[in-house]
Each structure stands twice: as C-alpha cells, then as structure tokens.
Amino acid sequence: YADAIFTNSYRKVLGQLSARKLLQDIMSRQQGERNQEQGARVRL
C-alpha cells in the first residue's frame, strides 16, 4: 500500500518536473526567436 502511494506520488513529481522542463524549453526557445527578430530589426 505504501509502495503504491510512493510510486504514485513519484510519478506525479516526475510529471511535474518534465512539464516544467518542457515549459522552460518552450519559453527559452521563444526568447531566442524574439532576440533574433530584434537583431534583424536592428540590422534593417
């Protein structure tokens, strides 16, 4: 019983961690695109 609770919460934590990493990846990717756009505008 305790083992099931542990694996359940462990899976939940892993899901939160991977979701957070996914969000960070998306955010940094958007930030990079935004920086490239600003650089292109400066060149123009």
Curated annotation (Swiss-Prot):
Keyword annotations: Amidation, Secreted
GO MF term (any one): neuropeptide hormone activity
GO biological process: regulation of protein localization
Modified residues (Leucine amide): L44
Keyword Secreted listed: yes
Pfam families membership: Hormone_2
GO annotations of cellular component type: extracellular region
Residues annotated as signal peptide: none
InterPro entries: Glucagon_GIP_secretin_VIP (IPR000532), VIP/GHRH-like (IPR046963)
Subcellular location per the Swiss-Prot or TrEMBL entry: Secreted
Record keyword Coiled coil present: no
Biological role stated in the UniProt entry: GRF is released by the hypothalamus and acts on the adenohypophyse to stimulate the secretion of growth hormone.
Remaining remarks: The carboxyl-amidated somatoliberin is twice as active as that having a free carboxyl end.
Family, as annotated: Belongs to the glucagon family.
Protein name: Somatoliberin
Taxonomic lineage: Eukaryota, Metazoa, Chordata, Craniata, Vertebrata
